[in-house]
Amino acid sequence: SVFPSDDVTRAFLAAEGREEDFIPLESDPDAQYDRVIDIDLGTLRPMIACPHSPDNVVPVETLAGTRVDQVCIGSCTNSSLFDMLKVAALLKGRTIAPGVSLSISPGSKQVLTMLADCGALTDILSSGARLLECACGPCIGMGFSPNSGGVSLRTFNRNFLGRSGTKDAQVY
């Protein structure tokens, strides 16, 4: 199967200085498949993994009003430049709520450099967010662990019991 390349693909390559590598890809109009699965992405609901398993998911709106002590954004799996620019736009001109700590973990030096070059890193840091190294860290309980009994909202790909470095934390 082929997911067609589009303007988003071209923009990514341009940001990487590789726009000349863009190749339009799409399936042949007469291609035959054993099975076709069409997913209307507009019908998907945002989901969140509840403690203590990535498989323990519920619609995110069911957790509205949940107290959060800590937010960790980034990691090696969820910190593309596109995602980090969204974070910067949301934080621009705002400050982190009292009682909440926020960390940002760009997944690579390249993403960090691009954030700095375009000014987005300033917006993130001006909000009161803490910048962490481009490395394993809070995901494996190495720094920025939540408080005992705390609630941590993370964009990381794992939320197993104790993995955050705090056994009694509720990690989403």
Where are these regions (language model features)?
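Fe-S-dependent hydro-lyases/dehydratases of central metabolism
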Residues: 1-172
